[in-house]
Amino acid sequence: MKRKLIIILLSTVFLGFFIYGVAGFYVAYSILKIDHTCGWHENSKPNSWSTKIDAHEYSNLSRSRLRDSFPVNEYHLEEWQNVYFPSREKGIQLNGWLFNYYPDRPIVIIVHGIYPNGKCKPESNLIASLLIKEGINALTIDLRNYGQSDIVSDYEDLGLKSYNDVLGAYDFLKKIGFKSNSIGLHGISLGAVPVIFAANKEKDIKAIWADSSLAEFSMVLEDEIARYGLSIEFGPAVSFFGKILSGVDPVELNPAVKLTNDQNYFFTHGDKDQRMLSRHFDYFKKYAEENNIKSDFWLAENSYHVDGMFKYPDLYSEKMKNFFEDNLK
């Protein structure tokens, strides 16, 4: 009888660990497995992109209407160069669209977010257009595993490797004549992570814009796990399998601690963001204040995830102009 109870107990414990592991793997896989396409925006170009294509996909009616009614034709660009350049990590070739309109003017590298994504998406194209309207050049890029850049993995590295791609874009711009102090960075959602990490490696980059960025690993881990109806107790399992799948340690995903005192940052976020909660914005703000980081902050009112640029394009454009012109030469 005693032996039977022990067997039952051990079986129960084993089953519990098995379920725990399976749940952790499922969440990690679901988060990190990349869709290499651009989804509904596959084959979109700077002169043809549209927010209407996938407006019906947004479950939030406000976000859907915002994109369905956005006057995209006003923001199309007709001239760009299709460019290729190497990542700073050897063996990886990257693709971008170069909008080099203004001689002797600054340029901003624009980095997209998580899949399905790329320079094809409305967000990157809109930011490029707003910058061009303000007399600032732009380079939109596909990070590794996206768009026309090399596919080297089926799993997202969360910016912990792809920051080298941002540095590759930076090297490319220097090679074609742009000076270090005239190159700024703009990261959208998860794209803000490789942007912040890249800037930490190159202190000559003086202007870094982060739109709807995560700030700290334990916060985003808790947020992501909750989407699957699980508690933070599943965090270690998700982190373990995330490391196996992606080849990076997600615990290192702490962009806030990569901010420096000799660079300038602009953080913007939607106050109603449900994808990347605004507490990440609050975390950045508190960290910057406590560590004397030179930063500006704009919490866009009545805005969800990366909605600010679509809801307030003129204000967004003005803020970018002021920030980049103040901090780039």
Mark where each language-model region is:
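N-terminal cap/lid segment of alpha/beta-hydrolase-fold proteins
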Residues: 60-103
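Hydrolase active-site cap/lid region
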Residues: 197-248
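Conserved alpha/beta-hydrolase "acid-adjacent" motif
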Residues: 274-280
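Short beta-strand/loop motif that positions the catalytic acidic residue
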Residues: 259-262, 266-269, 273
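C-terminal catalytic histidine-bearing segment of alpha/beta-hydrolase fold enzymes
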Residues: 282-329
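Alpha/beta-hydrolase active-site loop
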Residues: 156-177
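Conserved alpha/beta-hydrolase
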Residues: 128-150
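N-terminal targeting or regulatory segments adjacent to alpha/beta-hydrolase or S9 domains
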Residues: 1-74
